[in-house]
Amino acid sequence: ALQVLSFDLPGHGGRKDEPAPCRIQVCVPELKAVMGYAKKRWAHVGLFACSLGACFSLAAYADEPLEQALFLSPVLDMRRLIENMMGWFGVTQERLCRERAIETPTGETLYWDYYCYVKEHPVRRWDTPTSILCGVRDELCEPDVTARFARQYGCRLLTRPEAGHYFHTPKELEALRQWLTASL
């Protein structure tokens, strides 16, 4: 029997109205605290993470002996995502360095210190047996990034041609259910 322990990132789910920023420097210590809690209670710990949660989990849990990881629409290269966002909104590195924080038209904020952090701390290790489900039409996480990560770290990769970043249609949710059932 599985026991599920859920954690929302700042600004998401049950923490939607929290003022804490959803940044790797904030979330990694929180994720490490959650892992400490889980390891005190259960001998076998696995991970399910989606989007930014996967990115932050890669940073927090690289040295953890996890049974397995399941990633849904994972952000696997935060540097590339930030640089893509900078390009979409015409923000140069020089401007971001000078202004330190720039709010985008989508409501997301680009931060210089965050950008520097992800440049200095790319994923260097991931030994956990991992399965990834993502959409071919993912507008945030480019398929080549996901495929390269899967090859580099020996992950099982399943792509859905009809899906984008957010799995939400009945067909996408059914694909998610089938993937979870097959993976567990």
Question: Where in the sequence are the language-model features?
Answer:
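Catalytic nucleophile-loop/oxyanion-hole region of alpha/beta-hydrolase
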Residues: 12-41
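Aromatic pocket-lining residues of Rossmann-like dinucleotide-binding sites
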Residues: 60-61
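Gly/Ala-rich beta-loop-alpha elbow adjacent to hydrolase catalytic centers
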Residues: 49-57
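Conserved alpha/beta-hydrolase
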Residues: 1-17
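Soluble or luminal CAZymes and related metallo-dependent hydrolases
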Residues: 26-30, 110, 172
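The alpha/beta-hydrolase serine catalytic core
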Residues: 44, 65-148, 152-159, 164-167, ...
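Nucleotide-sugar donor-binding loop of glycosyltransferases
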Residues: 8, 51, 136
